[in-house]
């Protein structure tokens, strides 16, 4: 993947972790379904950082099963129950995602009880 920074952007547009445009070459696209997390004991974690980490790990496992990984992700859809937790989510997202950050959108939505975040990842292989 090649990150493209349009001339109008002198710096990252908002300082948030995403790429404004990516150029992608590949033969096959892999998409995860909307993915939330459960803890390893089947419980839903009560804090955003743990939910974010576990959800990204679950997506990563799905991608591996399809023959790719987080480094192949070019777009992430983030669905959050409360955008006031955006910074907590981004802290984990920055730690776990590759240097060439995917394009991204984020929406505040209603989620199933207990869940704070749901992700859909688009990857190329």
Which residues does each predicted region cover?
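N-terminal presequence-like segments and the immediate start of the first folded domain
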Residues: 1-74, 80-125
